[in-house]
Amino acid sequence: SDLRATKGAIDAFRAMGKQCKDVSNGLPTFISPWIDGKKAIMGTGKLTREDAVSVQQHEKEWNEIFDGIHEVVDACAFQDGHIDYDELDAFFSVNKKLADRYGMQCWTNAESFDRDMPINFLPIKFDKLRMKLEAAKRAGYDKAITFEFSHFMSPQSAYLQAGHLYDRYREYFEIK
């Protein structure tokens, strides 16, 4: 397989993972990369792009990366915001399969802001966040984290919608 596309990522993740392991006496490490999907459009002025990575290409690239880093990276929490909602199950099941293959944990990094709006960025509607979390659950993910709680989900946020999103999240998960 042609490693040129992934070699830089492997070298960087392996070096950082090893350094973290060395300075922490072997504590667990995780990475949270993006998926190069149709919403990976920073700086283009568009809402989507045509040349997004396919599920098959994603699987090939991340199989190579995980093969090169699994000894020093314990978990991977892919950011979910660059792929479309109808692609969640396909990408998430591949991510989980690869993590399992290499003995890594598979987490989701559920973005709590909305990329589908012309205004960058507003808190996401709860139904969209719920869809992403439910897809992670269907795929058998180990944990969920979010980016970025303090701006887009905290009751203390300047965005009124953030407090509402937090309330809906607590209701859904029956958190008192």
Residue ranges of each PLM-predicted region?
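Glycan-processing catalytic domains of CAZymes
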Residues: 1-176
